[in-house]
Amino acid sequence: MAEITVELVSVERMLWAGQASIVTAQTTEGEIGVLPDHEPLLGQLVENGVVTIQPIDGEKLIAGVSDGFLSVSKEKVTILADFAVWANEVDTASAEADLNSDDELAKAHAEAGLRAVRRSSEGL
């Protein structure tokens, strides 16, 4: 099976690095799926989107991301996000409360996290 190297990095931490069969991300141009040997491109992530990684070995990984870039070469995908959180790390009750916050950053992070949770529960 063909593989592509993937790195998902936020301002705060490296979330994941490894080999995957496909990566999907929501960009300002639409949702994109990246397979090995994809044509090089640079994309801007949407404000509150979802990144999905299918590792070669293991379960599908789903992260909520907010702002940033997606860099694709034939061998590697690098996702640099201002904020990223795994769906299974999201405290749903706290995130839902943050949706009503006056703090725009907290609201954006909550929206990204909840989108990841929804995507995860849909099994997509």
Swiss-Prot record:
InterPro entries: ATP_synth_F1_dsu/esu, ATP_synth_F1_dsu/esu_N, ATPsynth_dsu/esu_N. Produces ATP from ADP in the presence of a proton gradient across the membrane. One of its GO terms (molecular function) is ATP binding. It is found in: Cell membrane. Belongs to the ATPase epsilon chain family. Transmembrane segments: none annotated. This is ATP synthase epsilon chain. It is a peripheral membrane protein. F-type ATPases have 2 components, CF(1) - the catalytic core - and CF(0) - the membrane proton channel. CF(1) has five subunits: alpha(3), beta(3), gamma(1), delta(1), epsilon(1). CF(0) has three main subunits: a, b and c. It comes from Corynebacterium glutamicum (strain ATCC 13032 / DSM 20300 / JCM 1318 / BCRC 11384 / CCUG 27702 / LMG 3730 / NBRC 12168 / NCIMB 10025 / NRRL B-2784 / 534). GO terms for cellular component: plasma membrane; proton-transporting ATP synthase complex.
